[in-house]
Amino acid sequence: MAGLLKSLPPRATRTADAAAVSRASKTVAATPTIKGGKSVYDRISTIVAVVNTKLGKYADKYDLLRDEKSVYDYFDNIMQYGMGAIDTETDSLDPITCTLAGACLYVPGSKAAYVPMHHVSYVTGVQSANQVPDEVVRECLIKCEEKRVKWVLHNAKYDRRVCWNQLGVQITPWWDTQLAASCLNENESHRLKDLHLKYCDSQDDESLTYDKLFEGIPFTYIPITTGYLYAAGDPIKTWELMEFQQKYLTEEKLPGPYYVFKNIEMPIIPVVAAMEDRGICLDKEFAAELSAKYNEQMKEREARIYDVLDMYKSEIEEYKQSHPNHILSDPIGIGSSKQIAIVLYDILGLTSPDKEKPRGTGEDILLRLDTPISQALLNYRETAKLLSTYVDKMPGILNPKTGKIHCSFHQYGAATGRFSSSDPNMQNIPSHNKEIRKMFRGEPGYVLISSDFSQQEPRTLAHMSKDENMIQAYIDGKDIYAWIAEKIYKVPYEECKEFRPDGTKNPEGKKRRDSVKSIILGIMYGRGAKAIAEQLNCSTKEAQKIVDQFYDSFPKVKKWMDSVLNNARRYGFVETAWGRKRRLPDVQLAPYEFELLSGGPSTFDPLNFDDDQGEAVVDPSVVAKYTKLLDKTWGGRERADVIARAREEGIKITDNGGKIADAERQCVNSIIQGSSADMTKLAMIAIHNDERLKELDCHLLLQVHDEVICECPEANAKEVSERLTSLMIGAAKEKIRVPMKCDAEVTYCWYGDALEV
């Protein structure tokens, strides 16, 4: 893990860290200053004082290993035990460009230890004395790998990447307490100190938050005798947390989460680490072309907004005269939501389609307003976002060492176990705008091969529901959306497809197919008829009719969904095909919670007091009365009136309906999305470990939900694409009886023209 900097707020970027180092290392007459105006000297003096005061009591419990013999001896103890905990301390969150300040170690039978490696004087930048050379730690880690030492870590991917990029050694994680914590409970904080305090009966003073204390100060600047007091405790915490987790994942008989942890989450750590280290190339020339194009487009779209506003020049002037304290600028600030709201609602007299946002100016509201000004604003914002988020941003975040984009992939990015990515978010690159994705390409001489699971989630739905008709359709190679549309709309199968047999477009067929796709995805994502109707641009009644027809055609789907909800209400969780749990405690909430306010009626009897009475509670008859009233209400306004009346009587009522409904919507989706995520991860593990793909110089680069993107030499593209799809399809066979299908495409750039191979 990133040690000192691992838990910093979003400020901790490479750019900010580099700037802090640059400011602190300049030779100036006065002591340099950092964020907040305080000098580095003052900040480090504060850090030393606070750490020594709070953690000085641990000085005798930790070892500071500053000579080679001590380091060799400690690693010998680890190898003899066969296991050990390790943590790295660095000066930034980028494993490629960071400086390795030191390593923290722990093995039972020894004190926790800190090995300083690259601490420097914050004044001169000179390496501090009595530190251990990289070669010594590298040699010891290599020996540990040869002895197959089981390493215990927290956020193992980071430490593996640091050891590889800074020492040239790939350590093999055996237990990652961060991932184990996610498998045990995805709904809580997974910071090491939070978990240790909660589960390991920690006696430490965890009230001290170090993030703010160290903010902006590279750990390499911290004096060694202070730094080790902060750092050396982490591997002990990691070890103790591992022991707790191991007990619950094994002895407490949790086969599902344990299987997911040991067979999916742990094996995929090296896969993700390799993806992040490899990075992806950016076509800087093409990015510059796009920047020029979209900057010109943004000017045109900005001009269009003012052309539309000129149509209402007299109305705008009239508003200004009647509102002498108005905030409208000249010209009107199109980036100001307050000014745009004045134009839309006060000057043009429009009514917001969202009652909860009567003066909203967001994308969803502008879309539904559907006026010339709202459309012009949407077009302008679209271009501005493409420029600021992608086109102009990407060239500025290329890694200075590699010249590539190296994003971070988060294995438990979603509570369902689905990946997410950040810095940058490669999963959020627009798919509808192919130009943006075309900025990313393979290395010179390499091509990109993208392969995605076709209809991964509907196939998973067919398997989980055990609907024979849906399963058979996939076995027969049918387009499931067109096939279901045939059943619902009572028209031939070919009339429900986007293209006719002769290759010509079929608009009506596409409409039928798209409507069914929206329904199936809506069902899987817990959307109601109203939400589906908005997506299909039809009435709620019409959408509900189609949904009912779907359930009539596939009754086992409805039966399975009902059973999922019933089991969730009973047990508080749902489970994927591979055993990953998604805990949804809100499903089990009472519809209403009653709390006695001061002076309210209760069952407490002060004249007949005994200990068994406990705290005062709302009288059951009062609870029954208000529950009956609430159940009879129609809409939120009536319910709010009843709750207000109860409050006047000294009773606070909490309506849990929203929380319950939200949790219920997640039940089916968590199983489908979680199972699909497990499937994709197993496919990635198989691809990464495949010896033939290694021989063909194939490297995983990106993962975007149901799609993986690799690169390989162009000459190997045909065999790689065939091998890739075979491995992906095979990854599902262990648990999913519905045949999976994968479509592979070879291109020079992401979403580029397909190459013949």
Which role fits each region the language model picked out?
Residues A2-Q127, E145, N187, L195, ...:
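Conserved "right-hand" nucleotidyltransferase catalytic core of DNA-directed polymerases
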Residues A85, R148-A156, L448-S450:
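Acidic beta-strand-to-loop metal/phosphate-binding motif
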Residues T97-V149, N155, R160-T177, V704, ...:
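Structural signature of nuclease core domains in nucleic-acid processing machines
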Residues V169-D194, G477-Y481:
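Conserved beta-strand -> loop -> alpha-helix junction used to position metal-binding or nucleic-acid-contacting
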Residues K434, P458-R459, H463, A482-W483, ...:
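Feature representing long, continuous alpha-helical segments
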Residues I480-K511, A577-Q703:
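Generic long, charged, amphipathic alpha-helical segments
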Residues D690-V746:
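C-terminal structured "cap/appendage" subdomains that terminate the fold
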Residues W750-V757:
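Short, low-order "capping/linker" segments at domain edges
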